[in-house]
């Protein structure tokens, strides 16, 4: 499991890194808000420990930008006892928890276990790329602002794209997975359902799109 610690006091950051590494976590460090935001937006982290008082950009500003980008990475604020107002603000902006410095190692580890466990349960029924989630229980495509229901064929097709994101998938493979073994008559249907999905992605203002590779197949890509 990969964690990020965003803390400007290097000695504290390195102590947390050593504690977590000893428990088997992979831990990266950032020492200011700008770097922390850049790291978080990669989407590589299972959880972030984020200090509120940071150089260049505050922890509250980092959190706001992360949630605006549609990322739901669990974030635990590291706060001082005097920062009650910031704690409330942070929770209102979408922080998952906070822990007051100085803190006990066991308390920090317990909070990390709780938040990553809850996040894993949420992710179990979701596939995600960019700012779009596919809910495999409700068969809905979701963005931060809205959601759309998919038909059975649309869902099966989108699930293949999400599970094979950024890979070109041959047309015959898509047809086999969605319609089963069939003849060439299904190719027109495939194009129709691709068109339906593209319209729904545009409605959601998605930053991902279905790309056609002429004569071969399709891929689901993030917009550049």
Swiss-Prot record:
Under what name is this protein listed?
A: Transcriptional regulatory protein DltR
**Which CDD domains is this protein grouped with?**
REC_OmpR_DrrD-like, trans_reg_C
Cite the entry's keywords alphabetically.
Cytoplasm, DNA-binding, Phosphoprotein, Transcription, Transcription regulation, Two-component regulatory system
Q: Which Gene3D superfamilies match?
A: 3.40.50.2300, 6.10.250.690, Winged helix-like DNA-binding domain superfamily/Winged helix DNA-binding domain
Fetch the InterPro entries from UniProt.
Answer: CheY-like_superfamily, OmpR/PhoB-type_DNA-bd, Sig_transdc_resp-reg_receiver, WalR-like, WH-like_DNA-bd_sf
Ranges annotated as DNA-binding: 124-222
Question: Source gene?
Answer: dltR
Q: What organism does the record attribute this protein to?
A: Streptococcus agalactiae serotype V (strain ATCC BAA-611 / 2603 V/R)
Q: Extract the SUPFAM superfamilies matched here.
A: CheY-like
UniProt modified residues of type 4-aspartylphosphate: 51
Kindly list the biological process annotations in GO that this record carries: regulation of DNA-templated transcription
């Amino acid at each position: 499991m990969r964690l990020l610690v965003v803390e400007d006091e290097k000695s504290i950051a390195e102590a947390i890194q050593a504690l977590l590494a000893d428990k088997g976590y992979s831990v990266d460090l950032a020492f200011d808000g700008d770097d922390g935001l850049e790291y978080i937006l990669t989407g590589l982290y299972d959880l972030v420990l984020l200090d509120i008082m940071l150089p260049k950009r505050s922890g509250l500003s980092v959190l706001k930008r992360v949630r605006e980008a549609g990322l739901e990475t669990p974030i635990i604020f590291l706060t001082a006892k005097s920062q009650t107002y910031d704690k409330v603000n942070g929770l209102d902006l979408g922080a998952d928890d906070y822990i007051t410095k100085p803190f006990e190692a066991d308390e920090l580890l317990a909070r990390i276990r709780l938040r990553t466990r809850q996040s894993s349960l949420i992710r179990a029924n979701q596939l995600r790329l960019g700012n779009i989630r596919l809910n495999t229980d409700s068969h809905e495509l979701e963005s931060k602002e809205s959601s759309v229901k998919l038909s059975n064929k649309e869902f099966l097709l989108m699930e293949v794209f999400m599970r094979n994101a950024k890979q070109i998938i041959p047309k015959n493979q898509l047809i086999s997975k969605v319609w089963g073994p069939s003849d060439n008559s299904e190719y027109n249907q495939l194009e129709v359902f691709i068109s339906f999905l593209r319209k729904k992605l545009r409605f959601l203002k998605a930053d991902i799109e279905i790309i056609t590779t002429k004569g071969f197949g399709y891929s689901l890509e993030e917009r550049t």
